[in-house]
Amino acid sequence: MNTIKKFIHYYGPYKAVFFIDLICAAVISLVDLAYPQILRTMTKTLFTQDKDMILHALPVIAVSLFVMYIVQSLCKYYVTCQGHMMGANMERDMRQELFDHYQQLSFSYYSQNNSGQMMSKLVSDLFDISEFAHHGPENLFISLVKIVGAFIFLFFINKKLALPLIILVIVMFVFSFRQNAKMQETFMENRRKIGDVNASLQDTLSGIRVVQSFANEDIEREKFKKSNEAFLVSKRDNYHCMGGFMSSNLFFQGMMYLVTLVYGGYLIAQGEMQTGDLAMYALYIGIFISPIQILVELVEMMQKGLSGFRRFLDVMETESEIKDADDAVELKDVKGHVRYDHVSFHYSDDETPVLSDISIDIPAGRSIALVGPSGSGKTTICSLLPRFYDVTGGSITVDGKNIRGLTLKSLRSQIGMVQQDVYLFDGTIKDNIAYGKPGATDDEIIKAAKCASIHDFIMELPDGYDTYVGERGTRLSGGQKQRISIARVFLKNPPILILDEATSALDNESERWIQKSLEELSKNRTTITIAHRLSTIRDADEIIVITEDGIAERGTHAELLAQNGVYAAYYNM
């Protein structure tokens, strides 16, 4: 019931459309109910009169019915058009809300959840929700109006024949609700399995170059086949439940016709019912059966819609671990003095410490370099500064202000990152550079590209800055992508800079170009550099050696070589 309440909340902005839609649905149903009763009344009254009276009344009846069906048609148009648009608008609202929430969720959520499943919730789940949002209330309302209306007329025609039909309907609904619980389970499983299919597909397509380079198409085919077959099994279970549900309801509907014919014939034989009334009963049974069939289909639609909505709520009710404090303030006039004060950290799902008692002081405009073996926590130290994760002990300050007391947007807007794994968005080179400063002028973009030593290369391309980079920048080399990402940070112009192994995956020539760009980028900025190639960080103001036990050594390049310790051993390898 709580799920239904939350679902109803999304009708709020469209109340007027919703109620007009229900009124139109009621008109459609009442017109369908009215015709058999009009026919019955005329058969017993008008059509027993003389010829002249019948001919005189027919034009009035024709015009009245014509107007009635025109009104019904207009109502049907509104229900079909505006009703569907209401559902589409709700789908858009939910999708936007879900997308916005995805962007606010912490890194830990993305570490624990599959992007294919997330895309399934954003697309296919919400489509079924849209269909239910429109057709659910409308079909339920139409069906109830027709069922109640038909029963009233059936009682009005013959009470004795109506009683066994009520018993049949009650038995049918009890049976249907029991089947409904089983269907709900299969629909939820169906959702999970199609999410697995999406995840498998995305994983393979994203890594298609690796797949083909290793000639592992058969392995990927088997992986996809496994998830695809699992989805088929879930569909089979689903259809078994649906088959039992549909066939049992069809059986009960047949029993209604059987009772009407046999018991109605008995009542005629007993003189308790007229032959014409039995024919009218058959008409109303048809009207009565139709909404029952709609309700049966509605149950399937409801299960699809609500199972999708529950998955939607699972995400929406997941709170971000990283969010602004109630009294958070904006970070302004940043100098760039960064301080790690006895910082400790472990992941929320693992108590094993990643960092313990780390203290680093970086004066504004100074540079430090972090070196050490993989897994020692270098990237984690950098990830804590923009609050991709929160410290579990100690504190981090920028210009003396605890970062947990700052708004995330203002904090992150003052930090630029250049990473080893460069991500370029689908679009042009210009679009990707401008990502560092939305709304930047062409002159600003060109200046940033020149600073990153990528302008000349761009101008050699046929389309220049309007060159399409391909998905994830597949049309560019690693060095070209890296320089575009550096241009993006130049355009952002942050006072604090994080360089996370920005040159480790490049060839020597590309590294020289990138290193030159990074040196230019680092001027007068507080810079934290992670590097495996120690030759790139010799000029850092301080080099800190991180091991699994914490900070092992710290000092300048010359000082650490003189100590002949861990750093010297790395350098002389």
Sequence positions of predicted segments:
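Hydrophobic alpha-helical segments in the permease module
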Residues: 64-72, 76, 169-173, 177, ...
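Short intracellular "coupling" helices and adjacent cytoplasmic loop segments at the cytosolic face
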Residues: 88, 95-128, 199-223, 311-331, ...
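Membrane-integrated ABC transporters
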Residues: 1-32, 47-61, 79-90, 94, ...
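ABC-type nucleotide-binding domain
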Residues: 331-573
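An intracellular "coupling" helix at the cytosolic face of ABC transporter transmembrane type-1 domains
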Residues: 16, 107-108, 124-133, 137, ...
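Cytosolic ends of transmembrane helices, especially the final helix of ABC transmembrane type-1 domains
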Residues: 193, 216, 240, 288-315
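Transmembrane helix-loop-helix hairpins at lipid-water interfaces of multipass membrane proteins
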Residues: 18-75, 155-160, 271-275
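Transmembrane helices of ABC transporter permease
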Residues: 13, 17-27, 68, 135-189, ...
